[in-house]
Amino acid sequence: MIHFVAAGPGAVDLITVRGQRYLKEADVIIYAGSLVNKGLLEYAKEGCEVYNSAYMTLEEVIEVMIKSEKEDKMTVRLHTGDPCLYGAIREQMDILDEKGIDYDSCPGVSSFCGAAAALNLEYTLPEVSQSVIITRTEGRTPVPEREKIMSFAAHGATMVLFLSTGLLEKLVKELLAGGYASDTPAAIVYKATWPEEEAYVCTIDTLVETARKHQITKTALILVGNVVTHSHYERSKLYDPGFTTEFRKGRDS
């Protein structure tokens, strides 16, 4: 059996209980060495085979999985954050389907949740934004035409951008062209939840300058929207005394 396990955003203690158990039981661990906290490998039992996929191709990763399966070993494929976002897991799963090899997924904490925690943010504030757009700036990997930053920016919703720190000048131009005001709040969160985490609040207009000042060129998330400064929002209906729910009756004002 192959277990695709979410490593969490960085901090070792943010892996799930199930994910930790799988790591302890694994005979083989293939981890995304470019981003996964190597402290998680301390859960591996003695004799566990450990592979760093940063140095491997897809074919080489699959080869290890097939060998492990033939030897009746349990394999953990350890991906950063939650691999349902930019995790390149589907291509692995499709090949495993072709080979008739069973697998499952163990979800976890995505780095975009870690970024919110770094700034104590709520992405969905009443009367400010009730939607979160998770996307990336187009680089070497193309983005579908209908999913360009400009088209998403037109919504004015909260936006979380992965894989975009090295393309900030392009990102800023597209955000402004799409309709965001230049003074729209923004933030850069570097290595969210890691010991070396850094978080800086700025505006769209000062994103490039802020990243340059703090020498951040990769491994960061970009947050955009008025929720970043959490001002001018309305109180939630859920805890309003006059709001009736399944569990309590609202009181007349």
Each language-model region and where it sits:
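Class I SAM-dependent methyltransferase SAM-binding "motif I" and its flanking Rossmann-like core
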Residues: 11, 84-155, 198-201
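Short secondary-structure boundary/hinge segments and terminal tails
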Residues: 40-41, 61, 86, 114-115, ...
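A contiguous loop/helix-start segment that scaffolds small-molecule binding in enzyme catalytic cores
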Residues: 2, 71-75, 131, 139, ...
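Class I S-adenosyl-L-methionine
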Residues: 1-109, 114, 208
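Short secondary-structure boundary/capping segments
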Residues: 20, 42, 67, 124-125, ...
